[in-house]
Structures are given as structure tokens and as C-alpha cells.
């Protein structure tokens, strides 16, 4: 952590704890005490006593703030945007990692000592130990030997024992006789000429700045160029899968920066040495510079500030970058080439991205949910899953800020102890008397959020918080033709092809064209026969992840049948969620419901169309006949067939006529099953 040297504070000489000399003390001790008092109360004490003053720096963009409230308010904008992008990335990926035991490797790593921790609670406790060690960073430095002391008492004792020994070793002399009043003091010497100092150094290009305002303005040029490079990278991607790959690459950006910087400093490889040599030469004129900071100053002074923004050019693809580290990281893509997945033939730019992608095929679960025990392959999918358990964010700081990402939460906690990556001081500041601090202002009125415990100082911040955290995802990008909203700009570009009819992606096997690269890749699996997605329960393979997820619903159901039987609607209500509103049938999948609805659509179209040719009139169905059986004592004595249904009285009369004996009418039995 860069140390900020501030103005030295003067120690008052006439304090309550000043050294009191008794009148009974001998002359030798009085002379030594007077020498020590004069030394510690003069300019020597003020010029040798230093303490550190910490400023708060944003971990995302490097902006400096004097108070904690200002940097927290500023970081809120970065964190809300990045959490929304992570959620959208997880939803766009469309992949669900398998439920398998973890590999045993610790999912969390301490950023201070690189120790692997198994659970988030242990990681937070481990981080607290580091924070307590570095909680007190104020030290006092001796101006003669540059030794540091944790308290002013130790500093004064060191000055008395080490640097005032010459005055103590002098032979004692008797007290001087009383002298007349001293003459008036000479006029003070003129102040020394003011020296221009540039205490702020840029970590990207080593440029020195005199004030924090100039430092922030200079840092903005690097961040603008970085945003432009990321925007150009997104423009080159064609589909959501490639966008997910870019986001995986962004997760390893810090590792790539460290590897690139180590490659620049290494001398054992000729290509790295040539790249470092080319980084110190100006691309517009033959002048060579000794350092990257001198080169940046030369380009800004001679060729304008615009030329210093993207000063590093790739010799193979003519792309420009703002720093030599990014140029070296980009050059590895030309040297090492791309990396292809052997399972699904997906191509990645980095080996780390390929390894992370292959974990999905192997079913590794490195991140476990502490609530339900489910395993996930990436931290993004784990964070998205944890939001299903609770609506509030996962990590809460003592200052009131909440985070859904543990890494951002740990970086934020370091700002409370001053370890936020402040710029390095390269020159000291002349001492000046400390100014009295103004009384603290009363806190502004806080507006609480009705959905979470957070509160805000203004209504605009409260509305922005509710819209970004608790509201639905915004669709800021609109289609100029139909006005449909999208979350990302690349989705608008893909949607415009539906209006123009453009199909730029063609299959080399059958010549069929598609509007997106993802649809072409999905279609090519039908030619190659590759089924990259396999069910771990039954071993069945699928060409698309959506088909695998639909298939897994059969295994997750409480009852599984070898053959789907015909069950009543009440039995299928909780197992088949797709319902036909025409005939009332239930289906397990939407595809089955759509195929079934085509039958009703075809039937309706046939009823609406006129007959093409007169069809032969079918013969009338035979009229139903009614059979009446008359029995007597269990024996059938008459069978009567009628074409029209008869009443019960008429049937009894027919039976009596058939028997021919009126006295036997009481013994007649009518078989009502045939009436």
C-alpha cells in the first residue's frame, strides 16, 4: 500500500507534561535539560516528525476521496452496474451445472496470503485477522536515521538518546553570571524558494502529477481507452455464447495484467525483450525514451494528448492499446493461437477460459451453496442461485453497504483500513502548522428503502436504488423499427436481422443460411452427429442444453414411469404443466402441446374450407330397435322387437296379449335392462 506523507504536526512546548526543572537541581542537570527542551521545541522536531494520512480510493476506477462517505457513494454506481451484468450473463449462458461432489479444492482464496479457505465464514474470519494487523498504520520517522516509531513518546526518547548525545557529552560548565537583557533578535531569513513537486505517480504510465485533480484527470484517459477497447471487443462478438466467453476473459483480466507485466520485466525470452524495447520507442518519430513515463510525456508534448491514449500498436492486426501490458497480453493470442473444446468444438482465446468451460462437461462443482448444498462450476452461477434463497444481498459491511459478490465485499472492507491502493508519494511536503478541524456537520435526513434496510440521503438516490436493485431489469436499448427493448446492444443488432431478412451465416455442408452464429453452430451438430450434453442419470445425450434440461425434469419428478400411461387430469395436474384449452389434455413438454394443437388447427381449417368435389352421401344409419323380453317364473316366454321406444304400460299390454291369459298378468316380470 502506497504511503501518503502529510504535513507534520507541531508539538506544543508549554504543555502540561513539559519537563519541570526543580530549583534544587544542580547546574549540570539544568543545562542538559535546557538543551533537550530547546531541541525538541524548535524546527528540528517539526521537520523530523511525520505521520501518514490516508485517502480513500475507488477500487474500480481509482478516484480519490477525502472522506469515507464520498467514496462509498461513488462506488455504489460501479457495483450496481456490475451486479446487473453478472446476473444477465448467468441468465444468457443457459447452462445448469450437474450435481456432483466437489473436487476437494478450496473454493475461496485469501488475497493477502493466498491461503485456501473452504467456507465464506472462515474466509471472513481470516480476513479480519489481516485487517486487525494493519488497523493502525500511523508511524513517526526520525529525520536523521529514517527509523520509524509507533508513538511520539518513543520518537522523543530516541531523539534524546541517539541524536542529542553530543550535547550531553560536553563538559559541564558553571552557571553563567546574570547578564543584561539580550539585544533584539535579527530579522527572520527570507523563505526558501518554492519547489514544484509532483507527488502523485500514475501506475499505468509512471506519469507524475502535482495535485489530486490532475492525477484523476490523467487516470480518466486510461479508463476511457479501456472502455473503448471493451466496446470494440463486444462489437466483434456475434452471439451470446461468445459474449459469455468475453466475460470469462474479463474475470481473468487482473491475472493477465500480472503475467504481462512479468513478461515485460523478464529478460530470458527474446520476444519479450523486443516488445519492451518497442514500448520505449515513439511510434511517430525516431526518438527513444528511457522509461514508459518519459515516453508518455514525450508523445503528449510533441504529438498531442490524443496520440498518448492508444500509443501501443500491434504489428500483426494494427490494433492499438493504452499500455504495454495490454499489448503483450494481446500478442499472446497471435503466438499461442486459440483453444478448441474437444467435446463441443467451441473455441476460446485463453486456456483458462477453456478449462473453465470444460468443467461444465466434467460436471465439477467447485462452489457450494451453504443453504441447500448444491454445487456450481462458477461463482457467477452460485451468486445467481443464492438470490433464490433470500431477496437481500449476501454480504453486508459495517458501514451499511451490501454486496452480492464476495470479492467486491472484501475489496470494499479494505477501504476502511486505508489499504485501498492509493497512489505513491515520491516527494515530501514541507511542514506546516496544523489547522483546527471544523465541527462535524449534522447528518442529512435519511430516506429508508421500504424493501431493504438501506437508507439514502436524497430521493433521487432512493429511486435509482429501487429501480436497479428491486425493480425489473431495464431494457435500455430499443429497436428503431418496432420499438422492442433489449438489455444489450448486441441483441438489438441480432434482432434487426429479422426486419432486414439478412442471413449472413451459411452452412458449408447443406448451404442453409442462418441469422445468427449460435443457430448455425446448433445446426451443424446435425451434420456431425455430436451430442455434447449428456444426462448423468441415464446416459442419454443431447445436442442442446435446453433439451437436456427438459429431459432432466423426468428424473426430478417424484414418480417415474417406464411408459407414460393415460392418467386422468387430476393425476397429471402436478406433473404435466402444459394444458390444451381445446380438449383439456395435459402434456409434459411445450413441444408436445404445440404438436397436439396442430391437430385442432388442421380440423378447424377443414371445417372452414368448402368441399372440392361432391362426396357421396353416406347411407342413413339403421334405426335403433328396442327388444322386450317377457319372462314367467324365470323362463322367457316372449320376445318383442319395436322400432320406437314404448312406455311401460304399453309394454305390459303387449306381454299380456302374447301370453293370452289375463290371469297370468300378475306373474309377468319385465326385464327392465332392455327397456
Curated annotation (Swiss-Prot):
An example GO CC term for this entry is:
nucleus
Q: Where is the composition biased (Acidic residues)?
A: 235-261
**What are the start and end residues of every segment in region (Disordered)?**
160-195, 225-283, 415-439, 606-625
**Which compartment or compartments is the protein found in?**
Nucleus
Q: Which Pfam families match?
A: zf-C2H2, zf-C2H2_4
Task: Give me the stretches of Pro residues compositional bias.
Answer: 171-194, 611-624
Give me the stretches of Basic and acidic residues compositional bias: 225-234
Principal localisation: nucleus
Name of the protein: Zinc finger protein 526
Say which species the protein is native to.
Mus musculus
What is the gene name?
Znf526
Amino acid at each position: 500500500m502506497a504511503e501518503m506523507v502529510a504535513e507534520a504536526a507541531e508539538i506544543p512546548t508549554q504543555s502540561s507534561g513539559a519537563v519541570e526543572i526543580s530549583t534544587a537541581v544542580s547546574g549540570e542537570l539544568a543545562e542538559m535539560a535546557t538543551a533537550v527542551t530547546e531541541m525538541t521545541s524548535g524546527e528540528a522536531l517539526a521537520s523530523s516528525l511525520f505521520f501518514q494520512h490516508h485517502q480513500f480510493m475507488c477500487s474500480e476506477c481509482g478516484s480519490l476521496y477525502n472522506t469515507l462517505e464520498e467514496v462509498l457513494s461513488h462506488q455504489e454506481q460501479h457495483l450496481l452496474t456490475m451486479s446487473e451484468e453478472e446476473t444477465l450473463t448467468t441468465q444468457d449462458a443457459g447452462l445448469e451445472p450437474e450435481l456432483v461432489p466437489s473436487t476437494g479444492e478450496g473454493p475461496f482464496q485469501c488475497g493477502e496470503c493466498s491461503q485456501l479457505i473452504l467456507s465464506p465464514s472462515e474466509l471472513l474470519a481470516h480476513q479480519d485477522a489481516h485487517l486487525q494487523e494493519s488497523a493502525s498504520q500511523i508511524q513517526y520517522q526520525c529525520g536523521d536515521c529514517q527509523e520509524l516509531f509507533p508513538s511520539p513518546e518513543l520518537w522523543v526518547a530516541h531523539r534524546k538518546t541517539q541524536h542529542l548525545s553530543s550535547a550531553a557529552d560536553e563538559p559541564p560548565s558553571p552557571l553563567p553570571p546574570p547578564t543584561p537583557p539580550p539585544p533584539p533578535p535579527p530579522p527572520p531569513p527570507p523563505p526558501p524558494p518554492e519547489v514544484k513537486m509532483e507527488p502523485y505517480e500514475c501506475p499505468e504510465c509512471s506519469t507524475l502529477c502535482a495535485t489530486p485533480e490532475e492525477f484523476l484527470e490523467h487516470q480518466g484517459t486510461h479508463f476511457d481507452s479501456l472502455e473503448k477497447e471493451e466496446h470494440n471487443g463486444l462489437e466483434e462478438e456475434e452471439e451470446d455464447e461468445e459474449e459469455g466467453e468475453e466475460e470469462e476473459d474479463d474475470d481473468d483480466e487482473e491475472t493477465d495484467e500480472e503475467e504481462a507485466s512479468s513478461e515485460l520485466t523478464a529478460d530470458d525470452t527474446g520476444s519479450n525483450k523486443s516488445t519492451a524495447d518497442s514500448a520505449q520507442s515513439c511510434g511517430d518519430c525516431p526518438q527513444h525514451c528511457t522509461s514508459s513515463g518519459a515516453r508518455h510525456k514525450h508523445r503528449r508534448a510533441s504529438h498531442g494528448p490524443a496520440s498518448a491514449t492508444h500509443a501501443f500498436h500491434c504489428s500483426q492486426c494494427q490494433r492499438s492499446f493504452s499500455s504495454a501490458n495490454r499489448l503483450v497480453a494481446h500478442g499472446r493470442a497471435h503466438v499461442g493461437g486459440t483453444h478448441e473444446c474437444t467435446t463441443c468444438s467451441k473455441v476460446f482465446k485463453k486456456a483458462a477460459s477453456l478449462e473453465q468451460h470444460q468443467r461444465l462437461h466434467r460436471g465439477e462443482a467447485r462452489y457450494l451453496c451453504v443453504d441447500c448444498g448444491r454445487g456450481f462450476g462458477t461463482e457467477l452461477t452460485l451468486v445467481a442461485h443464492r438470490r433464490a434463497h433470500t431477496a437481500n444481498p449476501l454480504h453486508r459491511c459495517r458501514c451499511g453497504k451490501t454486496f452480492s459478490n464476495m470479492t467486491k465485499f472484501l475489496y470494499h472492507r479494505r477501504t476502511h483500513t486505508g489499504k485501498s491502493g492509493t497512489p505513491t508519494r515520491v516527494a515530501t511536503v514541507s511542514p506546516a502548522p496544523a489547522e483546527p478541524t471544523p465541527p462535524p456537520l449534522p447528518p442529512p435526513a435519511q430516506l429508508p428503502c421500504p424493501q431493504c434496510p438501506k437508507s439514502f440521503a436524497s430521493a433521487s438516490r432512493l429511486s435509482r436504488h429501487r429501480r436497479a436493485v428491486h425493480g425489473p431489469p431495464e431494457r435500455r436499448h430499443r429497436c428503431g423499427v418496432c420499438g422492442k427493448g433489449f438489455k444489450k446492444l448486441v441483441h438489438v443488432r441480432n434482432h434487426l436481422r429479422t426486419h432486414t431478412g439478412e442471413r449472413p451465416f451459411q452452412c458449408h455442408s447443406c448451404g442453409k443460411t442462418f441469422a445468427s452464429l449460435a443457430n448455425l453452430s446448433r445446426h451443424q451438430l446435425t451434420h456431425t452427429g455430436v451430442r455434447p450434453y449428456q444426462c448423468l442419470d441415464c446416459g442419454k445425450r443431447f445436442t442442446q442444453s435446453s433439451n437436456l434440461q427438459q429431459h432432466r425434469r423426468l428424473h426430478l419428478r417424484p414418480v417415474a414411469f417406464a411408459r407414460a400411461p393415460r392418467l386422468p387430469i387430476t393425476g397429471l395436474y402436478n406433473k404435466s404443466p402444459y394444458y390444451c384449452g381445446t380438449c383439456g389434455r395435459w402434456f409434459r413438454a411445450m413441444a408436445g402441446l404445440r404438436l397436439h394443437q396442430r391437430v385442432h388447427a388442421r380440423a378447424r381449417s377443414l371445417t372452414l374450407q368448402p368441399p372440392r368435389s361432391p362426396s357421396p352421401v353416406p347411407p342413413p344409419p339403421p334405426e335403433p330397435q328396442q327388444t322386450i323380453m317377457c319372462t314367467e317364473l324365470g323362463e322367457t316366454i316372449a320376445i318383442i322387437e319395436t322400432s320406437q321406444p314404448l312406455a311401460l304400460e304399453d309394454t305390459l299390454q303387449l306381454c299380456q296379449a302374447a301370453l293370452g291369459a289375463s290371469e297370468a298378468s300378475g306373474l309377468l316380470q319385465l326385464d327392465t335392462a332392455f327397456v
